Amino acid sequence: MKLSPREIEKLDLHNAGYLAQKRLARGLRLNYVETVALIATQILEFVRDGEKTVAQLMCIGRELLGRKQVLPAVPHLVESVQVEATFRDGTKLVTIHDLFACENGNLELALFGSFLPVPSLDKFTENEEDHRTPGEIICRSENLILNPRRNAIILRVVNKGDRPIQVGSHYHFIEVNPYLTFDRRKAYGMRLNIAAGNATRFEPGECKSVVLVSIGGNKVIRGGNNIADGPVNDSNCRAAMKAVVTRGFGHVEEENAREGVTGEDYSLTTVISREEYAHKYGPTTGDKIRLGDTDLFAEIEKDFAVYGDECVFGGGKVIRDGMGQSSGHPPEGSLDTVITNAVIIDYTGIIKADIGIKDGLIISTGKAGNPDIMNDVFPNMIIGANTEVIAGEGLIVTAGAIDCHVHFICPQLVYDAVTSGITTLVGGGTGPADGTRATTCTPAPNQMKLMLQSTDDMPLNFGFTGKGNSAKPDELHEIIRAGAMGLKLHEDWGTTPAAIDSCLTVADQYDIQVNIHTDTLNESGFVEHTIAAFKGRTIHTYHSEGAGGGHAPDIIKVCGEKNVLPSSTNPTRPYTHNTIDEHLDMLMVCHHLNKNIPEDVAFAESRIRAETIAAEDILHDKGAISIISSDSQAMGRIGEVISRTWQTADKMKSQRGPLQPGEDNDNFRIKRYVAKYTINPAIANGLSQYVGSVEAGKLADLVLWKPSFFGAKPEMVIKGGEVAYANMGDPNASIPTPEPVIMRPMFGAFGKAGSSHSIAFVSKAALDEGVKASYGLNKRVEAVKNVRKLTKRDMKLNDTLPQITVDPETYTVTADGEVLTCTAAKTVPLSRNYFLF
């Protein structure tokens, strides 16, 4: 067959498209993936028929599906569909714009060649689904003034050339094409007063008046035609005008030009509606964004942009030499990478800013650009000739997620993790051994070495926990010195009070965290006996609700203990009407139980309680459970840590209403929930000085999202300042966007880049032992620290300490006397709209 890679990828696209056709044929409304796959696949087939042109196929593609054939969210998710195929005259790009213009599509065309039955249009009826608009922006009504309080002038400009001339917003106007004739003296130190990145076009022979404003910042002109190089002052103005005359640049004096200050004189003032501003640069202060297809709205609390001086990359845009990009700054004085105009959602706030990256670290969040011509540029956020740009307009940025409950059962889970937005994995294991399938322990020093070596080139941060189950502390030292950054106590190894005390004693000695899965059997005692064994020492309790394991039925009480850092795992996030039914078989497999042994079945059933799972929802919403993690392949889904966190937040908003009285946004709830998978697991595990938030000095582990896909599918994952994974189309295509668009590894994930931009977390003892050199690790190796004196009060926005009781017979949970109960959700967001299976 001699199939090329692009042909193999198109076969995957065809499989998805044919699956979509089968679903359409049985009367199902298609989701985002199905819709794109079907349209792209049919275009490929029509091209193969050889009878249609590109233009004809662009029209046909719009006819295939109507609004009734797709889920209500789909028209807001699919902007266009692009695919490249082999026509009679070679490979060509087909782009389908303006989809879903009609109520119904041409289903005969949509199913042409599939030999599937064409369903009646009567099957596609409207129902009472929630018609949320994914990623919608709600703007305030007032307009914004661009370039406010600046000197401005109106000048008459004539194009005396025979070709059109287009001038960008930040081009120094005195430097423009010599065939534009105007008063260049009055234009000295000025630029167009238009939206950043826009341009004004002068057709041949055209005369028009333009408004110019003074440049900002240090007022230094660089670049262009080198007419007026240097600071704006009288001496340089005279030299510039001499060059204008000498070099034959068009110049005519305009004596009565109108001058004034923007914002004071309406004729000199440029305004823009908030809707148009949001379309160009993303929402600004006071505007709101819907997160995915949830009912959560994030309101921008602060925007660092200077209206009119936004940094925008592209042809004729702002970030060009002497304009948004400074001239003459050496590499050490400028950013390596800037993410422009991004909405940042972090526990610290919801802001709009540029993000500066240098040497793999976040340098700052604020205003980036060229301080020679722009106001309020941060001194450490200069864009220079050595700066790469990632356009963040219209995107949301979060810190890379931290999953601190990972069973390392197979290496493939790493790729599901990173493509979902996780950049740090903490847990234990050795592969699909039965011990790892049940517990997050890497027991032997040689196995610790194996895990650190095997993950060395993977583009994530890793930390591995040793087995902590030993009543005699002498056995625990070696695994810590071998590289364990924490210890795990698990009931499958015997989490007795003696083992707990021994493990915590050793952890105190080495300043490492202890993660505990308590005794479901109540074999050595009840939950109060385990709490007593803690002796007030810091401990991180895994799946604190209990379905994942722990004292039955009341392990959830630990969420009210000051020395306990509670987390829960995602299979019970949130409580839905199918949650209970899936859990029994899940548990039997994970913990090596036998369905033919009654005691094994009783053990499993004792852990699955609707009442405590429902209470878990509410305790998360109250901030009493501080962390959400996966429990990967051991009763949890590593690729759904983020989505299930936001599903829980959405469910709680719908059932409990606003968290703060009178709020007209969901900012507090959003910050509380994002903290559960970013900063709080970082703090709990001693990593927060390196990762866990979008703050200066931390590793640039960042996740970029389209608002409409927030929480479901990231657009890009940046690891240590470099793009590690991103949505990327056909690698052979003329542009990067034709189907199949897949979350693919990028250069930041290959070769030595995967290790050079990531960290292996170990104990200080292991670092001092020299494990980096002795194991031959390429990754940066850092020691965890500052975990032994942590309390619940250190958990950001999730530090509530309720008094919790659980009725041992009815399993009713109360917190400070309030019965915690909620109904199971029948539907959740971030699900059917986005995923093929």
Swiss-Prot record:
GO terms for cellular component: urease complex. Keywords: Hydrolase, Metal-binding, Nickel. Ni(2+) 1 binds at residues 405, 407, 488, 631. Its cofactor is Ni(2+). PROSITE patterns: UREASE_1 (PS01120), UREASE_2 (PS00145), UREASE_3 (PS51368). Its EC number is 3.5.1.5. Carboxylation allows a single lysine to coordinate two nickel ions. Substrate binds at residue 490. It is an enzyme of class 3 (hydrolase). GO terms for biological process: urea catabolic process. Plants with decreased expression of EU4 exhibit increased susceptibility to the fungal pathogen Phakopsora pachyrhizi. Belongs to the metallo-dependent hydrolases superfamily. Urease alpha subunit family. This is Urease. It comes from Glycine max.
